Amino acid sequence: MGLYTLMVTFLCTIVLPVLLFLAAVKLWEMLMIRRVDPNCRSPLPPGTMGLPFIGETLQLILQRRKFLRMKRQKYGCIYKTHLFGNPTVRVMGADNVRQILLGEHKLVSVQWPASVRTILGSDTLSNVHGVQHKNKKKAIMRAFSRDALEHYIPVIQQEVKSAIQEWLQKDSCVLVYPEMKKLMFRIAMRILLGFEPEQIKTDEQELVEAFEEMIKNLFSLPIDVPFSGLYRGLRARNFIHSKIEENIRKKIQDDDNENEQKYKDALQLLIENSRRSDEPFSLQAMKEAATELLFGGHETTASTATSLVMFLGLNTEVVQKVREEVQEKVEMGMYTPGKGLSMELLDQLKYTGCVIKETLRINPPVPGGFRVALKTFELNGYQIPKGWNVIYSICDTHDVADVFPNKEEFQPERFMSKGLEDGSRFNYIPFGGGSRMCVGKEFAKVLLKIFLVELTQHCNWILSNGPPTMKTGPTIYPVDNLPTKFTSYVRN
């Protein structure tokens, strides 16, 4: 009797719950698969749907690149999963991505996860559609015109030089990633939002911490309860909005008083455009647009600038080639060391630009983009059902691109060939593509070129830990924060 009781207890406490759990998982997957379009003969992509309701969101959040690499190796360039509360198809490879990026408004439409839309705002450029997207994009593009970029250069150069001097004065190693986030945050606050340097010093620490909290919880389960990721993200967002609102009101007041400015920052241009528009931005829309600019203008550039320090620290011959290119422009009379840079000079630094392109190829700061299927369509023999999310992967597309020989190696020279760049339109997509291509890509290129010129002209550096392990969340970064020792460089 005792043995029988023990067996029953074992079955009830261990075996039965396991069987019920497995049955629930199977029923969940069957429920998801039943949502296919019966009018389409093509099968769903291979893959798994994970746990009921949660899907595979937790594995993605906890494992990121390891999880995505395992999925790609197992299922190939198109597979189904369940992420952030929605059935999802992940897509990679130039031909597949081309169909998604060029299918905007016909096959797919942009749709970021609910948590992203809630925190950043549903009316931001990345979340609106049609005419509204076209008008907002046109307004924001004014802030990234060639003339605007020319006016931004002195501010960028000043902030970069100041940061480099601080790094050189430190006896110990510099944690590059946190320092880079501070630097890019200051640049974005001044150029994109028009904060004064004194104001940045006062609010910087609180704003950086709030922004970190917001970014950390940007991709979370859409559950707004105390202490949830979404709750913490919204609380941080509200603090950022309060500081931005103060600045917006000050700008409107200065504009009414016709106070002269040295240059017009991106937010000022948005305010002016709104006043002339038939559909002016509300204060809330202004705050959301400014927050989006701040995210796009500093989080991604901080990631790429950190990767630049890493790759050049591991490939010192590239540093020397950048220096030689700059010296060539000095000898041609186009540049005097220590003086101001210009758009004309930056355009001429072809190899320096290739170093940035190669960095973006291996470590694109943003791993991919989100879309939703507007109707059921076929992609490479598989059915993509209407209403399912589609994630196109930038990093995986770069990884599987055959147009890049020796793709594991850091070789900026590969981009010196114009033919390669022309022939790799959808094999190389660090800024996305189609009508949703990053509006600030030219600003990012200018900023990163200035950073690279100043860094190589003033510094030598050694990575304390060698090649770091990289993690994504939501942009790519080194898990050890890239401790680096900087020393002064003196040209012979």
From Swiss-Prot:
GO terms for biological process: anterior/posterior pattern specification involved in pronephros development; atrial cardiac muscle cell development; blood vessel development; brain morphogenesis; cellular response to vitamin A; central nervous system development; forebrain anterior/posterior pattern specification; heart development. This is Cytochrome P450 26A1. Its cofactor is heme. One of its GO terms (molecular function) is iron ion binding. Belongs to the cytochrome P450 family. One of its GO terms (cellular component) is endoplasmic reticulum membrane. It is found in: Endoplasmic reticulum membrane; Microsome membrane. The lineage of its organism: Eukaryota, Metazoa, Chordata, Craniata, Vertebrata. It is a peripheral membrane protein. It comes from the Eukaryota.
